[in-house]
């Protein structure tokens, strides 16, 4: 009887085989618009620290907090709109900026492909929602059902026919927690940018295929299951 995989990575690769993802991984690798599964992490990209105690990227959207205008600006620039909720003292928010977005290839990809509007979960700035309602940041978070931070909300790239609406109807995917690894974060943004959710709503299948790609690119001694 063959031995069972024991390490987490071997389990993941076994799942990829069991789910028939070898072909999917090859297809994704051959896709001309799919970016590399990883890239250079140096030079590191340190965040800014704002007066309200939040970490911030210098390229975050300079917004007047009218989300309709932010969407239009993102679309005109060929980007996707994402709204990021954070709060002061959030360790996962700090890690997002100091660990994940500090990696050069991740920072570059998100900056080049997304217009990110940062909001404070407890903030008092007035925000105009897509339906024209004007609410404080904290009231908007409550309206949208945002409880944890960091939470990112990705919007569809075309809101034709949805004018005057707000909420989940405008969102591209189900919300996922952002307290995860750099690779998962990167894969999620690629998955959304290229609208791969239109092929398969299951992000995990895409992510597992990308893990397999990364493993295949490692030198042989670094691959899981190698013994001396």
Q: What do the PLM-derived regions correspond to, one by one?
A:
Residues 2-13:
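Bacterial N-terminal signal peptides that target proteins for export
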Residues 12-23:
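Bacterial N-terminal signal peptides
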Residues 32-71:
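N-terminal "domain-start" segment that seeds a small globular fold
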Residues 62-81, 110:
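A short beta-strand-turn-helix
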Residues 76-91, 116:
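Short active-site neighborhood of thiol/selenol oxidoreductases, capturing the structured segment around
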Residues 94-111:
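Typically the conserved alpha-helix immediately C-terminal to a functionally engaged Cys/Sec
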Residues 106-135:
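Thiol-based oxidoreductase modules, predominantly thioredoxin-like and allied folds used
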Residues 142-200:
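Non-catalytic, surface beta->alpha helical segment in thiol-disulfide oxidoreductase systems
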């Amino acid at each position: 009887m063959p031995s069972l995989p024991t390490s987490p990575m071997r389990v993941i690769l076994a799942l990829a085989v069991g789910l028939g993802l070898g072909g999917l991984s090859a297809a994704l690798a051959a896709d001309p618009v799919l970016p590399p599964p990883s890239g250079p992490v140096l030079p590191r990209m340190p965040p800014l620290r704002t007066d309200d105690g939040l970490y911030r990227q210098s390229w975050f959207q300079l917004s007047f907090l009218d989300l309709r205008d932010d969407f239009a600006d993102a679309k005109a620039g060929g980007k996707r709109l994402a709204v990021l909720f954070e709060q002061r003292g959030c360790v996962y928010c700090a890690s997002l900026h100091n660990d994940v977005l500090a990696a050069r290839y991740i920072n570059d990809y998100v900056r080049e492909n997304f217009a990110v509007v940062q909001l404070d979960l407890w903030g008092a700035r007035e925000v105009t929602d897509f339906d024209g309602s004007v609410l404080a940041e904290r009231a908007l978070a409550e309206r949208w059902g945002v409880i944890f931070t960091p939470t990112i909300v990705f919007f569809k790239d075309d809101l034709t026919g949805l004018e005057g609406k707000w909420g989940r109807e405008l969102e591209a995917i189900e919300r996922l927690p952002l307290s995860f690894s750099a690779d998962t974060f990167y894969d999620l943004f690629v998955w959304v940018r290229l609208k791969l959710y239109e092929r398969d709503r299951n992000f995990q299948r895409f992510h597992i295929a990308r893990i397999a790609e990364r493993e295949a690119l490692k030198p042989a001694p670094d691959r899981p299951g190698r013994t001396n």
